Amino acid sequence: MTNIRKSHPLMKIINNAFIDLPAPSNISSWWNFGSLLGICLILQILTGLFLAMHYTSDTTTAFSSVTHICRDVNYGWLIRYLHANGASMFFICLFIHVGRGLYYGSYMFLETWNIGVILLFTVMATAFMGYVLPWGQMSFWGATVITNLLSAIPYIGTDLVEWIWGGFSVDKATLTRFFAFHFILPFVITALAAVHLLFLHETGSNNPTGIPSDMDKIPFHPYYTIKDILGALFMMLILLILVLFSPDLLGDPDNYTPANPLNTPPHIKPEWYFLFAYAILRSIPNKLGGVLAVVTSILILILMPMLHTSKQRSMMFRPVSQCLFWMVVADLITLTWIGGQPVEHPLIIIGQLASILYFLIILVLMPITSIIENNLLKW
């Protein structure tokens, strides 16, 4: 009799994806973050669903409804902070996942990589809209500033912004539609993640060496199921420490003040995971230029396969490229720091230099370094 796991139409899909999947024998812990992102997504959908049961998307009651969730709903505070800090964990995993792809040349799987970039954009859009929902000061002004950037688009900009707002300013209509989009997008993300996985399983996983591993595969279960569970436990531990000991560590105190269109906060800034982009935006004095720079800073990921000039896929055996990679990481951390600082003399120039360095390393130095390393192999 055939095993039901291998014959049942539904079980067969699960089996081929998570049980009998042939996986490289040498993939390191950097390969854990795909499954961690899946866990984050499930956590966000579940906590978000329970929050939506008590939340009201009306400008007069939104702030109060979030307070009500924290004070009156059973474990509402836990659900709310799991959701808020779960988003931070989501982005930490996302950045590491993308960084792993860049380091080990996983971007050579074109379909998987491009869907991954679309996923990144979708998650960023979802997180932005979620940040608007509590209707605090930073929610309101963050929404105003970021949506206003679209007005930099020539000819249609102003109309586009007013169309997104549903009026002449961020108001009730904006909040309602942001809630609707914030609710539906995670399901779009789930569908995209399934397609991401589908394309990945067409080629099989990459590995740290970047060398094809077809001759040395092991079954996903039990080896990588156990490994993923260990990673998940670590992540949940960090998340729970964050939620139970310092739930507001990554938030902004301004968001505990109800939204007031007549009072602008002294420093408008997004959540920490958008600060690097915000720093790039602010480093260019021109509005359209700043918007283009921000979009390019993320869209640059799509160009990675075209910028790959090395004969080796992975950076494992390319020490100079490794140095440049870690320079990009340090540069992004610098940009994140600058994005959270006020616009003052020494900080402005640091932000501008960090922004220039980011594009310089990725677009110029990395491809040239790869060519030099290719020639060094001939010695």
Swiss-Prot record:
Keywords: Electron transport, Heme, Iron, Membrane, Metal-binding, Mitochondrion, Mitochondrion inner membrane, Respiratory chain, Transmembrane, Transmembrane helix, Transport, Ubiquinone
Binding site for heme b b566: 97, 196
Known cofactor(s): heme b
Example of a GO biological process term: mitochondrial electron transport, ubiquinol to cytochrome c
Annotated cofactor note: Binds 2 heme b groups non-covalently.
Membrane spanning stretches: 33-53, 77-98, 113-133, 178-198, 226-246, 288-308, 320-340, 347-367
InterPro entries named among the record's database cross-references: Cyt_b/b6_C (IPR005798), Cyt_b/b6_C_sf (IPR036150), Cyt_b/b6_N (IPR005797), Cytb/b6-like_sf (IPR027387), Cytochrome_b (IPR030689), Cytochrome_b_C_euk/bac (IPR048260), Cytochrome_b_N_euk/bac (IPR048259), Di-haem_cyt_TM (IPR016174)
Membrane topology according to the record: Multi-pass membrane protein
Cellular compartment(s): Mitochondrion inner membrane
Gene3D superfamilies named among the record's database cross-references: Cytochrome Bc1 Complex, Chain C
GO CC aspect terms: mitochondrial inner membrane; respiratory chain complex III
Positions that bind heme b b562: 83, 182
Pfam hit, one: Cytochrome_B
CDD domains named in the record: cytochrome_b_C, Cytochrome_b_N
UniProt similarity note: Belongs to the cytochrome b family.
Function: Component of the ubiquinol-cytochrome c reductase complex (complex III or cytochrome b-c1 complex) that is part of the mitochondrial respiratory chain. The b-c1 complex mediates electron transfer from ubiquinol to cytochrome c. Contributes to the generation of a proton gradient across the mitochondrial membrane that is then used for ATP synthesis.
Subunit: The cytochrome bc1 complex contains 11 subunits: 3 respiratory subunits (MT-CYB, CYC1 and UQCRFS1), 2 core proteins (UQCRC1 and UQCRC2) and 6 low-molecular weight proteins (UQCRH/QCR6, UQCRB/QCR7, UQCRQ/QCR8, UQCR10/QCR9, UQCR11/QCR10 and a cleavage product of UQCRFS1). This cytochrome bc1 complex then forms a dimer.
Miscellaneous comment as given in the Swiss-Prot or TrEMBL entry: Heme 1 (or BL or b562) is low-potential and absorbs at about 562 nm, and heme 2 (or BH or b566) is high-potential and absorbs at about 566 nm.
Protein name: Cytochrome b
Name of the gene this protein is made from: MT-CYB
